[in-house]
Amino acid sequence: MQVENPIVSLHQVEVNFDGYKAVNDVTIDFPAKGVHFIIGPNGAGKTTILDVICGRVKAAKGKVVYQQKREIQNLKPEKIVHMGISRKFQNPTIFPTQTVYQNMKLAIISGKSPFWYLVQTKLTNKQKHKIDEVLDSLDLLLYKSAISGSLSHGQKQWLEIAMAIINEPDLLLVDEPIAGMTPKERNKTGELLQKIGQERTVFVVEHDMKFVKNFSSAVTVMHEGRIICRGDFADVVNNQEVIEIYLGRQE
């Protein structure tokens, strides 16, 4: 699959955990913009791919090239964040005793001043407006003064997504965003990710095939650390190897 102007490229990437190859000689270009899903059985290497891209896990071999010009496989996670790659993990990592606004404040100035000074830092009017804008885009503006721990599970996930995009990353990495959500929250999350994907690139690791079908721009399938198929959802579900290895297990 030819990709012009990829946002990130992996070249012969390998990751080993105590002799086990979690990622095995992966080479792939990911296109910019849209919502790109990475699917596969447990242990396929999906989350590890995200970990390598954001610097949380170092590859034993290979290169990770960001925006066709910068190798990032050896950079620290905080450096990668400042380059425009943001990560949202499966479980929300918000500050539950702080308000929604305070969480957003911490996110917008994180990395720009020492942590112990964050709560005293005053925001500019531009930053305050940006917080309101992002909260509104994720339907959280009405909860701006609410204690974040009082939010529903879905709202906590949306708050963390808001925190992840407040500094306008070019690439957002999301791990199983709909786990534990109600059907209504799942649909809303998909719509929010599609909205975000209109302006930036979103990678999503997910198991729910209905969610993937409804909200994917493209799908990459992994198995035992390797990429076995990629394309749109129709391409993937009609691929015989995918049916045998992955989809058949869900029947």
Which role does the model predict for each range below?
Residues 116-143, 191:
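Conserved ABC ATPase "signature" region
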Residues 172-176:
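Catalytic Walker B motif of ABC-type/P-loop ATPase nucleotide-binding domains
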Residues 63-82, 122:
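ABC ATPase NBD Q-loop/coupling interface
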Residues 39-41:
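The feature captures the beta-strand-to-loop junction immediately N-terminal to the Walker
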Residues 54:
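Helix-to-loop junction immediately C-terminal to a conserved catalytic motif
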